[in-house]
């Protein structure tokens, strides 16, 4: 194996960050992502939920196509008006938005084009994170361990990401993690501590 890359969704001191870390055979370390939802978090649960909300309001405005999400999200939240939806989203923390990601999966499972595009964007973001770290490490061949909640439990994101990565970086192969996400997060924290990264 030429090296290994780990998409790690959780860091011990921060919640819901998409971060890819890798190390090559020479022991060099590279990281991509982990910037948080206010800066850049493509492929995260928050991003999927935010994009699902955007699809709904675009339909309501007449700027976007009809989407099943405009039925699923208000039904899940018990909101009947745009004002109630706004109050829900802005009345809590970001976990409220991230909690909507499974509805994007539900809509994608029914062939909803807006939801499928949300997954295309999310998988492209994850692929870009992996290939950026791999490029900095000079890795053309290696393994990518799929760690974290979404990649473990969201079939659509996992399938879209693995297919996108296979097309764009055929030498990087997705593998099941050798340990659980908590162990991966601990390893990531140690790697970052050794490298002096925040």
Language model: regions and residue ranges:
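ATP-binding/phosphotransfer module of carbohydrate and carboxylate kinases, centering on a glycine-rich
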Residues: 2-10, 53-198
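Phosphate-binding/catalytic loop of phosphoryl-transfer enzymes
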Residues: 1-67
């Amino acid at each position: 194996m030429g090296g290994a890359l780990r998409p790690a969704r959780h860091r011990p001191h921060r919640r819901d960050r998409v971060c890819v870390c890798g190390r090559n055979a020479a022991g060099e370390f590279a990281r991509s992502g982990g910037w948080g939802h206010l800066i850049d978090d493509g492929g995260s649960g928050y991003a999927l939920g935010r994009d699902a909300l955007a699809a709904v309001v675009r339909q309501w405005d007449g700027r976007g196509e009809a989407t099943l999400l405009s039925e699923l999200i208000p039904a899940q939240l018990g909101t009947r008006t745009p004002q109630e939806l706004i109050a829900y989203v802005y009345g809590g923390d970001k976990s409220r938005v991230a909690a909507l990601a499974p509805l994007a999966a539900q809509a994608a499972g029914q062939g909803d084009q807006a939801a499928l595009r949300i997954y295309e964007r999310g998988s492209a973001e994850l692929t870009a994170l992996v290939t950026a770290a791999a490029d900095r490490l000079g890795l053309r061949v290696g393994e990518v361990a799929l760690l974290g909640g979404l990649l473990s439990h969201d079939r659509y994101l996992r399938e879209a990401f693995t297919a996108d990565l296979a097309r764009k970086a055929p030498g990087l192969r997705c593998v099941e993690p050798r340990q659980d996400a908590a162990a991966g997060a601990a390893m990531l924290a140690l790697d970052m501590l050794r490298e002096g990264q925040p």
